[in-house]
Curated annotation (Swiss-Prot):
One of its GO terms (molecular function) is DNA binding. This is pH-response transcription factor pacC/RIM101. The gene is PACC. A zinc finger (C2H2-type) spans 18-42, 48-70. Transcription factor that mediates regulation of both acid- and alkaline-expressed genes in response to ambient pH. At alkaline ambient pH, activates transcription of alkaline-expressed genes (including pacC itself) and represses transcription of acid-expressed genes. It comes from Penicillium echinulatum. It comes from the Eukaryota. The lineage of its organism: Eukaryota, Fungi, Dikarya, Ascomycota, Pezizomycotina. It is found in: Nucleus.
Length: 70
């Protein structure tokens, strides 16, 4: 068997199947970084703060999108 056939990725049949275990959420993803990012939805922390207006966000990509509006 070729290594690429066992590779865990978008085209593999052996993908990870990660499901959020928070309450009854059940969001599923195949990438660890996606589930890690998703878990921030359930936590009240907002560590990413806008330097222009002070608005805070849970995820860096949300702050980045917000800053484009300034």
């Amino acid at each position: 068997e070729h290594v690429c056939e066992r590779h865990v990725g978008r085209k593999s049949t052996h993908n990870l199947n990660l499901t959020c275990q928070w309450g009854s959420c059940n969001t599923t993803t195949v990438k660890r970084d996606h589930i890690t990012s998703h878990l921030r939805v359930h936590v009240p922390l907002k560590p990413h703060k806008c330097d222009f207006c002070g608005k805070a966000f849970k995820r860096p990509q949300d702050l980045k999108k917000h800053v484009k509006n300034h």
